[in-house]
């Protein structure tokens, strides 16, 4: 499984890259606005740090405006993946952009039907929002299973990104069914390192080592 960071914060991205476990980054207008940074400069900076796919989202809602905006975003860096909303206009834009070789990530996906249409249009990635689905009383994991089965049945090359990840178990559940990518908030990524027995074990090793040194004197 590939791990993307869902953030526009440079310090978080730098830390993830230093850990050696981050394959890409996803951003959205909300994340960028929180940073108070220039949009294009921040996307370029992230691309230089990660050296992997970096999703940057269009603001337009009409297909022709999406295409124009997507071309500009794609020109920022070769690593840019253009996020397109799951709408009829969005799918039309994805079809055009895919034919031009521009990588796309269809976002705000909440059903297998939507994921099927995104793959048919040639999307590079599709992002089901599993956390929001769970929040709404439905089963985000079940949606991932449906999408993975459909893509396997027909040999679609579109990669699935588990998005709207709320906790480490979302990552485990996605990994167990073979989802290609999880895009993870930095706080959730940090939690993936943790287990109380690991802390207990480290403490015990250190205590034993100190005891050993005392006995050697």
UniProtKB/Swiss-Prot annotation:
Pfam families (alphabetical): TAL_FSA
Provide the GO MF annotations for this entry: aldehyde-lyase activity; transaldolase activity
Q: Which SUPFAM superfamilies match?
A: Aldolase
Name where it mostly resides: cytoplasm
- Which residues belong to the signal peptide in this entry? none
Q: Please list the residues that make up the active site.
A: 83
- EC numbers listed for it are 2.2.1.2
Q: Name one GO biological process term.
A: carbohydrate metabolic process
Please provide one cellular component term from the Gene Ontology annotations of this protein: cytoplasm
Reactions catalysed, semicolon-separated, are: D-sedoheptulose 7-phosphate + D-glyceraldehyde 3-phosphate = D-erythrose 4-phosphate + beta-D-fructose 6-phosphate
Which InterPro entries does the record associate with it? Answer: Aldolase_TIM (IPR013785), TAL/FSA (IPR001585), Transaldolase_3B (IPR022999), Transaldolase_3B/F6P_aldolase (IPR004731), Transaldolase_AS (IPR018225), TSA/FSA_arc/bac (IPR033919)
List keywords of the entry alphabetically.
Answer: Cytoplasm, Pentose shunt, Schiff base, Transferase
Q: Where in the cell is it found?
A: Cytoplasm
The UniProt function text for this chain reads: Transaldolase is important for the balance of metabolites in the pentose-phosphate pathway.
- Similarity comment text for this entry: Belongs to the transaldolase family. Type 3B subfamily.
Classification via HAMAP family: Transaldolase_3b
Show the NCBIfam families listed in the entry: fsa_talC_mipB
* Protein name according to UniProt: Probable transaldolase
Species name for this entry? Answer: Fervidobacterium nodosum (strain ATCC 35602 / DSM 5306 / Rt17-B1)
């Amino acid at each position: 499984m590939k791990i993307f960071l869902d953030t526009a914060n440079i310090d978080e991205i730098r830390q993830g890259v230093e850990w050696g476990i981050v394959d890409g980054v996803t951003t959205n207008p909300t994340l960028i606005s929180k940073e108070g940074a220039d949009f294009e400069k921040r996307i370029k900076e992230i691309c230089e740090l990660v050296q992997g796919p970096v999703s940057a989202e269009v603001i337009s809602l009409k297909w022709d405006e999406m295409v124009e905006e997507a071309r500009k975003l794609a020109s920022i860096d070769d690593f840019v993946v253009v996020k397109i909303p799951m709408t009829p206009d969005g799918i039309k834009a994805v079809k055009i952009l895919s034919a031009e070789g521009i990588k796309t990530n269809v976002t705000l996906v909440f059903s297998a039907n939507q994921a099927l249409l995104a793959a048919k249009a040639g999307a590079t990635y599709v992002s089901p929002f599993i956390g929001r689905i769970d929040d709404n009383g439905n089963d985000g994991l079940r949606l991932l299973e449906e999408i993975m089965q459909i893509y396997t049945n027909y040999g679609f090359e579109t990669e699935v990104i588990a998005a709207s990840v709320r906790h480490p178990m979302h990552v485990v559940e996605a990994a167990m069914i073979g989802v290609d990518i999880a895009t993870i908030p930095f706080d959730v990524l940090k939690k993936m390192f943790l287990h109380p027995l690991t802390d207990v074990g480290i403490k015990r090793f250190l205590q034993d080592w100190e005891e050993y040194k005392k006995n050697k004197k």
